């Protein structure tokens, strides 16, 4: 079942969905008294063959007003109706009617929040944390290495600017006497 039909049936819509309708098994069979006239599709088949030939020869697309599409069928094939109104003649709920286009809702100034900085400063007077405390916290959050930097004379140590090596390097190893005595046994 195609998505428009499934959506219409799931929502219980009374209106039939637009677009190319495929026969389903639940439709009522034609009445026995109905006579079928043979339809002449030879002109449509020739136009379709011509359009296919043009596409095979390198055409990027075929315009909708070409004879390859039947009259008035190109919109139904794509799933769009030619007019913007439903089959009952009423505009869709997401569209504005022609008379309502100038009556758009306007933003009201009363909806905006008004800041009173003086009132906020008075409220913050009893706050034990002042702006310096807040700035100090922010600088440590942004630059966490600041708290680890030495405060005295700056001596260059390359280990501050490089990640630690995967294999530890010991420049000076000191062994205690008797440290490896049990390893020899």
Curated annotation (Swiss-Prot):
Q: Which GO terms describe its molecular function?
A: histone binding
PTM annotation (Phosphoserine): residues: 66
Keyword Acetylation attributed? yes
GO BP field: chromatin remodeling; muscle organ development
Biased composition of type Acidic residues is found at 78-89
Supply the InterPro entries for this chain: COPR5
Q: What ranges does the record list as Basic and acidic residues composition bias?
A: 42-52, 66-77
The subcellular localization recorded is: Nucleus
Principal location class: nucleus
Instruction: Report the residues modified as N-acetylmethionine.
Output: 1
Can you supply one Gene Ontology CC term for this chain's record? nucleus
The job of this chain, per UniProt, is described as: Histone-binding protein required for histone H4 methyltransferase activity of PRMT5. Specifically required for histone H4 'Arg-3' methylation mediated by PRMT5, but not histone H3 'Arg-8' methylation, suggesting that it modulates the substrate specificity of PRMT5. Specifically interacts with the N-terminus of histone H4 but not with histone H3, suggesting that it acts by promoting the association between histone H4 and PRMT5. Involved in CCNE1 promoter repression.
A Pfam family that the UniProt record links to this protein: COPR5
Q: Where is this region: Disordered?
A: 1-109
The name on file for this protein is Coordinator of PRMT5 and differentiation stimulator
Tell me the subunit arrangement: Interacts with PRMT5. Interacts with histone H4; specifically interacts with the N-terminus of histone H4 but not with histone H3. Interacts with CBFB. Found in a complex with PRMT5, RUNX1 and CBFB.
This protein's UniProt keywords: Acetylation, Chromatin regulator, Nucleus, Phosphoprotein, Transcription, Transcription regulation
């Amino acid at each position: 079942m195609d998505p428009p039909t499934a959506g219409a049936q799931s929502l219980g819509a009374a209106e039939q969905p637009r677009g190319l309708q495929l026969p389903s098994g639940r439709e009522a069979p034609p009445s026995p008294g109905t006579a079928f006239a043979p339809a002449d599709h030879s002109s449509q088949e020739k136009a379709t063959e011509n359009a296919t030939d043009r596409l095979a020869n390198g055409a990027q697309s075929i315009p909708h007003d070409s004879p390859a599409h039947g009259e008035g069928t190109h919109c139904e094939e794509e799933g769009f109706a030619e007019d913007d109104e439903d089959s009952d003649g009423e505009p869709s709920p997401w569209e504005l009617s022609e008379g309502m286009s100038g009556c758009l809702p306007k933003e009201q100034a009363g909806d905006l929040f008004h800041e009173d900085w003086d009132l906020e400063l008075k409220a913050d007077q009893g706050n034990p944390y002042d702006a310096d405390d807040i700035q100090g916290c922010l600088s440590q959050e942004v630059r966490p290495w600041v708290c680890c930097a030495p405060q005295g004379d700056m001596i260059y140590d390359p280990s501050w600017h490089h990640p630690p090596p995967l294999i530890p390097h010991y420049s000076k190893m000191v062994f205690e006497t008797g440290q490896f005595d049990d390893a020899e046994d």
